[in-house]
């Protein structure tokens, strides 16, 4: 049973926010509006749950009325059967939220072990995420891309913007392993390669303040696949954050735009480091994550000869690899979210 006093606190806060926005009082209206918007689905679940309890209590009272008893006996089993689902939906709505879930994300993909084949797999992963983003109505902007000679990727950094981007893609961080016969393999032997994926919530200006004295900014010529020069101006920008050693590059044609993009990616990486530090300190939070959260953790295997994808964190195996590589990721992501929610619910019940 969910404590009634907790539900009343949420409803009172919601009513306060509604009144504060109506009369323009209470501080930062934009901040109040966001909190109000975040609480709305919770309040809707509370209302549905409380209405069900009220209907059940009313039906049970009707049992004492001879004229209404038959109707009550018909309604009560239906209402009782609906109660567990309503309570579960409310519990999910009450789970602690990751404040970064609503943010855009920075996607980073880099080949691991496997040479040319790993670079080709990195390119396959980028296509997979790009196609998934397209199905979700998200916008993908490439920030940095280094192609290999065979058409793979030595590095890919992209910004993905849209509704719920980080909330759905954050479970993709980790080592992705592929088992297949490489195009360069004449003997038909299956090789194992890997690529590392990192999904970072985009930082906002209020998250990270950077001292200009902590930066070294270099300009250089932008280059494409194979090292050829894309243009003749020194437009590419490389920013080094001296305290951490983080290095960010951006190589669009506008040097001013490159500096803006590189600074945004740097802030995002610093923000991610801070989030990791806080997560490490919260041992209970670490226990509730799907997997260890370590980006060196092998999270998934893509076996092409068998047409199989296995996610090792939740023991999920699907035999529809072509669809998955084509961007059909909802079944995997939904399963990961459900597992994460189940662990949080278990912690709430302790």
Curated annotation (Swiss-Prot):
Keyword set includes NAD: no
Pfam hit, one: RF-1
Main subcellular location of this protein, as a coarse class: cytoplasm
Segments for region (Disordered): 280-304
Keywords recorded for this protein, A-Z: Cytoplasm, Methylation, Protein biosynthesis
Protein purpose: Peptide chain release factor 1 directs the termination of translation in response to the peptide chain termination codons UAG and UAA.
Top-level division of the source organism's lineage: Bacteria
N5-methylglutamine modified-residue sites: 228
Modifications made to the protein after synthesis: Methylated by PrmC. Methylation increases the termination efficiency of RF1.
GO cellular component: cytoplasm
Gene: prfA
Subcellular location: Cytoplasm
InterPro entries associated with the record: PCRF (IPR005139), Pep_chain_release_fac_I (IPR000352), Pep_chain_release_fac_I_sf (IPR045853), Prokaryotic/Mito_RF (IPR050057), RF-1 (IPR004373)
Similarity comment text for this entry: Belongs to the prokaryotic/mitochondrial release factor family.
Protein's UniProt name: Peptide chain release factor 1
Example of a GO MF term: translation release factor activity, codon specific
């Amino acid at each position: 049973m969910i404590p009634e006093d907790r539900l009343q606190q949420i409803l009172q806060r919601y009513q306060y926010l509604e009144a504060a926005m109506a009369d323009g009082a209470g501080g930062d209206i934009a901040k109040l509006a966001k909190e109000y918007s975040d609480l709305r689905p919770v309040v809707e679940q509370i209302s549905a749950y409380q209405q069900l309890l009220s209907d059940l209590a009313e039906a049970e009272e009707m049992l004492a009325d001879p004229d209404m008893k038959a109707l009550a006996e018909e309604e009560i089993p239906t209402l009782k059967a609906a109660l567990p689902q309503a309570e579960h939906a409310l519990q999910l709505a009450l789970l602690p939220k990751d404040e970064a879930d609503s943010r855009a994300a920075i996607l980073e993909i880099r080949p691991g072990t496997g040479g040319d084949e790993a670079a080709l797999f990195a390119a396959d992963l980028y296509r997979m995420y790009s196609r998934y983003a397209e199905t979700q109505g998200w916008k993908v902007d490439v920030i940095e891309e280094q192609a290999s000679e065979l058409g793979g990727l030595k590095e890919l950094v992209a910004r993905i913007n849209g509704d719920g981007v980080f909330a759905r893609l954050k479970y993709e961080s980790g080592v992705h392993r592929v088992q297949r016969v490489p195009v360069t393999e004449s003997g038909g032997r299956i090789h194992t390669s890997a690529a590392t994926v990192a999904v970072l919530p985009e930082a906002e200006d209020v998250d990270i303040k950077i001292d200009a004295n902590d930066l070294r900014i270099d300009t250089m010529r932008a280059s494409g696949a194979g090292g050829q020069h894309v243009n003749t101006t020194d437009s590419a920008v490389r920013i080094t954050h001296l305290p951490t050693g983080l290095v960010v590059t951006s190589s669009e044609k506008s040097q001013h735009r490159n500096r803006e993009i590189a600074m945004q990616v740097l802030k995002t990486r610093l923000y991610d480091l801070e989030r990791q530090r806080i997560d490490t300190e919260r041992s209970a939070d670490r226990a509730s994550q799907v997997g260890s959260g370590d980006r060196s953790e092998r999270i998934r295997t893509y076996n092409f000869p068998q047409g199989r994808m296995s996610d090792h964190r939740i023991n999920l195996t699907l035999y529809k690899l072509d669809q998955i590589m084509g961007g059909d990721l909802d079944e995997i992501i939904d399963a990961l979210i459900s597992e994460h929610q189940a662990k949080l619910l278990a912690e709430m019940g302790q």
